[in-house]
Amino acid sequence: MWGGRFSGSLAEHMRLFNDSFPIDRRLWAEDIRGSIAWANGLERAGILQAAECQELIAGLRQVYQEFEEGLFLPLTSDEDIHTAVERRLGDFIGALAGKLHTGRSRNDQVATDTRLWTLGALKLADDLIRDVQAALLEQAKAVGEAMLPGYTHLQRAQPVLLSHALLAHFWRLDRDRQRLHDATKRVSVLPLGSGALAGTAFAVDRAALAAELGFTSISQNSLDATSDRDYIVEILAAIALLGVHISQLAEDWIIWSSSEWGFVALDDAYSTGSSLMPQKKNPDSLELARGKSGRLIGNLITVLTLLKGLPSAYDKDLQEDKAPLFDAIDTLSLTLPVVAGAIRTARFNTERMESALDDAMLATDVADELVRRGVPFREAHHIAGRLVREAEQRGVGMRQLPAESFVAAHPSLTDVAGLFDFARSVAMRDVPGGTAPNAVRDQLIAAQHVLAEG
């Protein structure tokens, strides 16, 4: 493909070093689609005769069939997917294959292939995330008005509905979906026709190419188009954050599944045992999901570091952009179905959750009631805090303090028995986005609409 300038061949270790076919071979379908569109473009530009174009396309379809059926046999001379396809095309149709690359560079070719592949990968990622969301929504609907302690700093804070806690992860994942969806318009930009860096010298209709390949726009600057990998960074950043959200979900559930908490039990299908300790049931599905987030963050850092030192236009360093992108999508494809399955099959111990609720978690309700009785909140906060301390010193729950303690704390606290009701505390948070049953019902409806809209 490029040997005319050189008098010798590559050293064997340099050939192996330069070879990207093991990585970019998965772009075979996109490469052939792009080549068919390019052949049509060359015909429209008068570079190819109609019969030549038809023969090229027929040959490309033969190559496509070989890949599709797993029959394609690479040669050591196939340094990348582009040379492999063109070489095999030549086997089928002879010298005419040499006309296909007219006006095209591997620089704009690989940029086009990768964008085409990424558009398909974004749809896959969306489906995978939606499935995890659906699993969370199914469980949130099933648990009714079960309550558990809500935690801040891993300390018991206030009671919340279990459904509310589950939906918190739903909305995080929805933001991840939105970020990936928003990136689509920046992926769907056609670089084909940009040549190596200066643009093709032939009058190819780039808008027609974009329409044929399903791109929504064409690039505006050929030098930028051949080196632009912003969209990969953007997608890897969104996926890294998705990984963090999955890790946070996993961390919550790993803690909940411990013997000390006992709030949730994972199904055997998503747990493993110990080679030494027969009693162990480990939440390895979620631990591995938590661990994969580091890999996803690493992929982002790899590409950012790759791009940092590059001058304008294409450099061979960019050959290293695809492995992190492919790995990110592969990791999601492996991880998210496991997470969805672990969620769907989990069993919640709602009695254990509700038994973990304690009176101190209602201290805010005492302060809120004082505010309703005309006490400034800061003073009310201080009064409630003193009552918590007194209960701790006596070794009792707040509700077990004598009536005199409440009246001594503030004269208005003459009837407080009704405050020590966890269901009441939850019901009082009846604002949009709150944990009250009414608010959570609205949230469930909103979540259902999000999934229905696709």
Swiss-Prot record:
<dbReference type="Pfam" id="PF14698">
    <property type="entry name" value="ASL_C2"/>
</dbReference>
<dbReference type="GO" id="GO:0005829">
    <property type="term" value="C:cytosol"/>
</dbReference>
<dbReference type="InterPro" id="IPR024083">
    <property type="entry name" value="Fumarase/histidase_N"/>
</dbReference>
<dbReference type="GO" id="GO:0042450">
    <property type="term" value="P:arginine biosynthetic process via ornithine"/>
</dbReference>
<comment type="similarity">
    <text>Belongs to the lyase 1 family. Argininosuccinate lyase subfamily.</text>
</comment>
<dbReference type="InterPro" id="IPR009049">
    <property type="entry name" value="Argininosuccinate_lyase"/>
</dbReference>
<dbReference type="InterPro" id="IPR008948">
    <property type="entry name" value="L-Aspartase-like"/>
</dbReference>
<keyword id="KW-0963">Cytoplasm</keyword>
<keyword id="KW-0028">Amino-acid biosynthesis</keyword>
<dbReference type="Pfam" id="PF00206">
    <property type="entry name" value="Lyase_1"/>
</dbReference>
<dbReference type="InterPro" id="IPR020557">
    <property type="entry name" value="Fumarate_lyase_CS"/>
</dbReference>
<dbReference type="InterPro" id="IPR022761">
    <property type="entry name" value="Fumarate_lyase_N"/>
</dbReference>
<keyword id="KW-0055">Arginine biosynthesis</keyword>
<keyword id="KW-0456">Lyase</keyword>
<comment type="pathway">
    <text>Amino-acid biosynthesis; L-arginine biosynthesis; L-arginine from L-ornithine and carbamoyl phosphate: step 3/3.</text>
</comment>
<dbReference type="InterPro" id="IPR029419">
    <property type="entry name" value="Arg_succ_lyase_C"/>
</dbReference>
<dbReference type="GO" id="GO:0006526">
    <property type="term" value="P:L-arginine biosynthetic process"/>
</dbReference>
<protein>
    <recommendedName>
        <fullName>Argininosuccinate lyase</fullName>
        <ecNumber>4.3.2.1</ecNumber>
    </recommendedName>
</protein>
<dbReference type="GO" id="GO:0004056">
    <property type="term" value="F:argininosuccinate lyase activity"/>
</dbReference>
<dbReference type="InterPro" id="IPR000362">
    <property type="entry name" value="Fumarate_lyase_fam"/>
</dbReference>
